[in-house]
Regions:
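Structural signature of tandem-repeat unit edges
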Residues: 2-19, 29-42, 52-65, 75-88, ...
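Short acidic DE-rich linear segments
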Residues: 506-508
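Consensus positions within tandem repeat domains that build extended binding/scaffold surfaces
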Residues: 21-26, 44-49, 67-72, 90-95, ...
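A structural signal for leucine-rich repeat
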Residues: 459-464, 487-492
Length: 508
């Protein structure tokens, strides 16, 4: 490798030199300017890497290849012109050239390596040559002053994080030639206001537009099939989005914390992923058509403005905490395709006054309606066999509830803290009532217990939240089961036990 002299901050490169070799001027912090002779055809790997005082360089028309890391970390370099002879610019060739404001890339360049301009925080504009077919990973990542870019019609791929953290980029047009857009490609482009996503790209990938905090409008063209994981996470200005019939799946966290999103229509979406719309605090309505089959856990959790939602008959699964904390939701109809209301499905829906549970439901899961403080009454269908732990815990307005004869088990704390509940009848098939089931039901005065019960805790009914006995007037029990209950209930409540004679069988 040839050795070169630096004199008064200027590199002396002799005529006849054909290559500036690997790391030739690496970390030459006193180097300020370079004139490369016409004989040079290649600038080698890391040739000027970390030349932090380099302000100007002239690259002759003889150079065809600028290799990887060639000018990486030249933090004082303000502009550069790449000659028409160059066809390839290597990976990280100009990475972290933080003072670079402009660069002219000739049409001869067909290949730009990964991370070429990554961290060029002063770069304001750039032209991408028409013959370039791929914009590689991180090519313009963290070019925070880049305000405009034109993607040529020949480009078929935009790599991972290609424009990530381009905070000044206000608009970008993605041509239909593009078939793949990588993960995080436009993530944290905080000035980007609108985007049209072409149908030629089948999937909006992981964090493609995440944290684009100025993004207001998104048009997704027909042809896109999936909106990926965290695709629009944290797009706090997003008000509207057009979802075409081609989209079949919205992945987990796709729109999490899109706090300005007001409404959305999902015409052919089959699956709504985990936490897909979690924290969309302005979302008032969502419309799903008959194609949706699954609403995953926490899908709409924390959507505090959600007032209207129609769950289509095609839905067979509503995941845990799917509507948790939807404090404006007043009513909801569950379709007869659903067989189970799982853990926390409607927990904390403090405005929910009515809910229609269909005959298809067999299980009401734990905490399903916990904290629904406006719920006054509920009809549980005869199909339900199990009421889970804490299912109606803290439903302070619940005055009456009819537990159907189909129920066999009532879980722990199922009705704990239902302070308006006055009476309850436990159906004939129930064999077990969990601990604290009716604890804190301060208005409860009468209870009817069945013959079928084989286990009951002393804490099941009889204490308020302070640990003192409820003011019960009557505990109705079958006469044949009276001894059983006296053995299991506190002695202080024995005088409240009213023995019921067996029902007379009707003659046929």
């Amino acid at each position: 490798m040839a050795k070169f002299e630096i004199k008064d901050g200027v590199a002396i490169i002799p005529d006849g030199t054909t290559e500036i070799g690997e790391l030739a001027f690496w970390n030459c912090t006193s180097l300020e300017s370079v004139t490369i002779p016409e004989s040079v055809t290649e600038i080698g790997y890391g040739a000027f890497d970390s030349c932090t005082s380099l302000k100007s360089i002239t690259i002759p028309n003889s150079v065809t290849y600028i290799r990887d890391h060639a000018f990486r970390g030249c933090t004082s370099l303000e502009s550069i012109t790449i000659p028409e002879s160059v066809t390839k610019v290597g990976e990280k060739a100009f990475q972290d050239c933080k003072s670079l404001k402009s660069v002219i890339i000739p049409e001869s360049v067909t290949n730009m390596g990964k991370s070429v301009f990554w961290g060029c925080t002063s770069l304001q504009s750039v032209n991408i040559p028409e013959l370039v077919t791929e914009i590689g990973d991180n090519v313009f990542a963290s070019c925070r002053s880049l305000n405009s870019v034109v993607i040529p019609e020949r480009v078929t791929k935009i790599g991972n994080d290609a424009f990530c953290d381009c905070r000044s980029l206000t608009s970008v047009t993605i041509p239909e030639s593009v078939k793949t857009i990588g993960e995080g490609a436009f993530g944290s482009c905080s000035s980007l206001k609108s985007i049209t996503f072409p149908g030629s790209v089948g999937t909006i990938r992981y964090r493609t537009f995440a944290r684009c905090t100025s993004l207001e409008n998104v048009i997704i063209s027909k042809g896109v099939k999936k909106i990926g994981y965290e695709a629009f996470e944290g797009c706090t200005s997003l008000k509207s989005i057009s979802v075409p019939v081609s989209v079949k799946e919205i992945d987990d966290d796709a729109f999490v914390n899109c706090t300005s999103l007001e409404s959305i229509v999902l015409p052919k979406v089959k699956k709504i992923g985990h936490s897909a719309f979690w924290g969309c605090t302005s979302l008032e309505s969502i419309r799903m058509l008959e194609s949706t089959t699954e609403i995953s856990a926490k899908a709409f959790s924390g959507c505090v403005s959600l007032k209207n939602i129609t769950i289509p008959n095609s839905v067979s699964e509503i995941g845990g905490s799917a509507f948790e904390g939807c404090t404006s939701l007043e009513s909801i109809a569950i379709p007869n395709s659903v067989t189970e209301l799982v853990l926390g499905a409607f927990e904390g829906c403090t405005s929910l006054k009515s809910i229609a549970i269909p005959n298809s439901v067999t299980h009401i899961g734990g905490d399903a309606f916990r904290g629904c403080t406006s719920l006054e009454s509920i009809a549980i269908p005869n199909s339900v066999t199990y009421i889970g732990n804490g299912a109606f815990r803290g439903c302070t307005s619940l005055e009456s509830i009819t537990i159907p004869e189909s129920v066999k088990r009532i879980g722990k704390s199922a009705f704990e803290g239902c302070t308006s509940l006055e009476s309850i009848t436990i159906p004939k098939l129930v064999t077990e009532i969990g601990e604290n089931t009716f604890i804190g039901c301060a208005s409860l005065t009468s209870i009817t217990l069945p013959e079928s019960l084989v286990w009951i805790s002393k804490s099941t009914f009889f204490y308020d939240i302070n640990g003192t006995y409820l003011v019960l007037t009557a505990i109705y029990v079958p006469v044949v089961k009276a001894d059983f209950y006296k053995q299991r209930l506190p002695e202080e409540l024995h005088d409240k036990i009213v023995e019921l004679a067996p029902e007379k069988k009707t003659k046929k």
